[in-house]
Amino acid sequence: MRILLTNDDGVEAAGIEALVRVLSPRHTVVVAAPAFEQSGMSHAITVKRCIRLDRYRPLEENYGVTAYRIEGTPADCVKLYLEAISADIYPEYVISGINHGANLGTDVLYSGTANAAMEAYLHGITATAVSLDMKSEISYDTAATLLEENLTSLFYEEGKVNFYNVNFPRQFCEGGPQFVFTQLGRRDYINAFQKMEDEDGRECYFLGGEILDEGNSEATDIVAAERGYISVTPLQTDLTDYIYLEKLLR
């Protein structure tokens, strides 16, 4: 299968290298990933300046893949590759990740990882965003292997375009790794901004905070991850509130 890999942690990240290591022996792999970390970039794209890129030799020399290091956002990387670099030989499948840290619930709206996958989906290509809990006991290689083993049975369906958000937990539940289909939960934060001063004495704020997960049902990705399951959430790009729209049109 022709697979495009991207992420928001940057082309040098361990998570994307694990995917290359596991996938390249059996698939035709191309990497198009940011030159630098781009966490929290959501679906931002670069305008009013050139996007520079070069080849990333370490991945090419170690694994025999084609790899691009792109000075842009995660969405830039996918958009640029598909529209300008690919020579109309599109990948059959796009994987964004493996992200260092979970992308659960409403955090997907801010996630560069998830939105890079969404960019592929907008181009009519099945895409999966993959994340691993920051404190996970599970290795990137294990996550990549489980993904590859379930590629055609769980994620890729010929003739149909799907968009999934996948999260690996801190540790697997009793009985070993299990994939479960979920819906997005709601993730909030306590004291999200920390007030500070910069080197010039000016007031500034650092985004952080403690996670606050309340009121999420058993059907959500957040609860599934807490219980040690690998959550698989199908996503879409249509944000229309059809129930309310129907009322407005009456």
Whereabouts are the PLM-identified features?
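Hydrophobic/aromatic ligand-binding patch that stacks against planar heteroaromatic rings
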Residues: 116-120
